[in-house]
């Protein structure tokens, strides 16, 4: 019996990444809050994208590979189209699509291979970016590590939900997920503390957009905690969190709307306002809930899915 590919908790986590980006882009934040949040919403978005690639690639074939490549290319094109209206926002879709293409072959690998590539990407990113003193907007090597990290979190938190597993295997997976979450809590506590330490070694910086070991490990740890919590809440209170899950199912659509509305708002009304950010979040939650209930798939998601099926029909490349 096939398991459902739509996981409520994963959709909630995806919506929290979008909400986090809205807050960072639009809200008037205290310096300390900026330090805490810097880079985490976008890295969470990337890590969840890596986990989503694993869901797409469960029955991996050459068709899957071609469709992931095509998906990445389409995301890049959408990102490029948004660049002229990005305004104060550094559009994340270009790097998202590029990394998706670069790691499109990895869902076919085993967990240990992906772990090895995660370590390699993290080391390469640290070697490259540690000497740099200025923040990197979206450092490519670190983003490759984020996507692979998301694939590893799929193995820990999601695989058993999508595959028929025995009771003993489910118990093992459950224990592993709690162990990973517990370790992630410790890493997050340490990382958040040292985000405020300017004297820390360059390779160990935990601050956002540095692309080094500290930030990468912290970002994956935060994503693990968020994902585990969202899965817990989504399993037990799906009705209460429906608006967030709905937003998560159409995150591309909401992100596009966010960039477009933020460009107008910040050019013509207010550059940064916490009230405005809250208003847009509520607006997008309502819009997503209504669209999901009465229409279904988000318009951008439907457009991308239709284009992918047209470009790479089922069975192509086998």
Task: For every predicted segment, state its role.
Residues 1-318:
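Alpha-helical transmembrane segments and their immediate juxtamembrane cytosolic regions
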